[in-house]
A protein has these predicted regions:
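Short, charged beta-turn/beta-strand-edge "cap" motif at the junction between a beta-strand
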Residues: 13, 53-58
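Short aromatic-glycine-enriched beta-strand elements
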Residues: 16-21
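Short nucleic-acid-contacting surface segments enriched for D/E, G, S/T with interspersed K/R
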Residues: 37-50
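Acidic-basic catalytic patches of nuclease active cores, encompassing PD-(D/E)XK
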Residues: 40, 72-104
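OB-fold/S1-family single-stranded nucleic acid-binding modules
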Residues: 56-72, 218-219
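Domain-level recognition of nuclease-like catalytic cores that cleave nucleotide substrates
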Residues: 173-226
């Protein structure tokens, strides 16, 4: 996926989950943050961030904050991007060969899962999780407690137990990650649910991405450590 009209800026602060203050062209600009997660380890005063200019002239903020530099790494932190890049990748045959349909926001049981991917005679239920938390080259999810994430995992487990192909798919919005693991220190229940689901047939996959200031693309599979 690609962004348009991307600018570099310097991060100042984040007064709430939705906006941040940045320095752009010598002036302070209020921008929309496309990720309501904590991201405390990413948005550090003085770091370089990347902004996409919005196309709606009537919106309150002119720019969206989409990526941030952390050391030598560039991290895409757009919470909407993982689903978009998965859909592009799956449509191009990256997920499975012979895909006949990709249905987003698929209702199954009591949940709405991100995708139902159809191949000849079979349904594949996919829940996508974007990962931006990195420690020493390894990625962790979640960066904050997510009861909805636990609910999605349990729904995938029920699907797997009926014989459907159920997949939890981590899109790591960083390049050259060594592994992905549940962040048990932050949300033990998520890790417990994930390990139980995997033991009952849910496939747990993770892929890192090629990241530039104006693009994101799924790159290669990385190990998941449960």
């Amino acid at each position: 996926m690609h962004y348009q009209n991307v600018r570099a800026a310097k991060f100042i602060d984040r007064p709430n989950r939705f906006i941040a203050h940045v320095e752009l062209d010598g002036s302070v600009e209020t921008v929309h943050v496309k990720n309501t997660g904590r991201c405390r380890e990413l948005l550090v005063p003085g770091c370089t961030v990347y902004l996409e200019k919005g196309t709606n002239p009537n919106r309150k903020t002119a720019y969206d904050l989409i990526a941030v530099e952390k050391g030598s790494s560039l991290i895409n932190m757009d919470a909407q991007a993982p689903n978009k890049v998965f859909a592009e990748w799956a449509a191009a045959g990256g997920f499975l060969p012979d895909v006949t349909a990709i249905r987003p926001e698929y209702t199954y049981g009591g949940s709405r899962l991100d995708f139902c991917v159809e191949t000849e005679g079979r349904l594949h239920l996919v829940e996508v999780k974007g990962v931006t938390l990195e420690e020493n080259g390894n990625a962790l999810f979640p960066d904050a407690p997510t009861e909805l994430g636990v609910k999605h995992i349990r729904e995938l487990q029920r699907a797997a137990e009926t014989g459907l192909d159920a997949v939890l798919f981590f899109v790591v919005q960083i390049r050259d990650i060594h592994s992905v693991a549940p962040n048990d220190a932050t949300h033990p229940a998520f890790g417990e649910a994930l390990r139980e689901a995997a033991a009952h047939g849910v496939r747990v996959l993770a892929y890192d991405c090629d990241v530039t200031p104006d693009s994101l693309k799924i790159r290669r599979e990385v190990p998941v450590i449960l």
